[in-house]
Amino acid sequence: QVPFGNRETEGIVVDRVAAPERAGDLKSITKVLSVVPIATTQSLQFIDLVAQHFACNPWDLIRSAIPPRVASVDKDFVSGEPSPQMGSKGAIEFHALAPFTQAHEQLVPLVAAHQKAGSILIVAPDEKDVDLVIASLRSVALSPLKLTAALTREERYRNFLFAMHGSNSIVVGTRSAIFAPIKNLATVIVHKESSHDHYELRSPGWNTRTVALLRSKFQSLKLILTGFSPSIEVSQLIDERKVKYLNSKENVNVKAFTPSEGALLPGRIFGDIKKALAVGPVLFIA
């Protein structure tokens, strides 16, 4: 806690030096709120990098990147600088989702294939997608950490610190989780990367995909983007061969019914609709 104008405000101690680098009077720190680190040198450098990219103040990003502190949770964690994040090969891939399988279920083999390399961060568009991904991972005996604003302040802050200090974690969260300083992070997965929910509503309007691309390069992380089709931005990167496009071959059965006498739907189509309804929802596109 430091004095700023006529009030006290929170700050982050980023370094300690023997002598000041600037002339003039310096204000003293009023109070140390916590001895538990909430950021690493690397994560603060990355926030500065993203701030430069979006031409904004780093604090505009810190409010998204670091959850509010809860004093009672700090007592459960030992003070000390978290280990540097290890990184991976830095490859970037777009995995096209198959049409006949639930999207969240298709992340399970991706996680299994990359788990040995280190911790994995999965960023999903919204709370519903996060819960579906977590349920799929738990169905194969994995224990992911949830990191979203829908958690209570205590749960969110606790999980944030667990992600910083735990080893080989699987963290699943919404867009703010892209900044989380996860220990031994090796792989980042941006699920449904073209979703509008990956865009921050507050200034400077950053989005998960762009921040993930910056982080992949900054930390040499493996980055996997998923979706049924790539966004325009990712399509350009695929054309430029900066992103590898991966998909599986799928066969789709197509039936054509010729309308008769101006009917909106041909009579013969209703038998197929009834059969399809026994399996799942039916979508009509006019």
Write out the residue ranges for each language-model feature.
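Accessory, non-ATPase domains that flank or precede helicase/AAA+ motor cores in DNA-metabolism machines
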Residues: 1-286
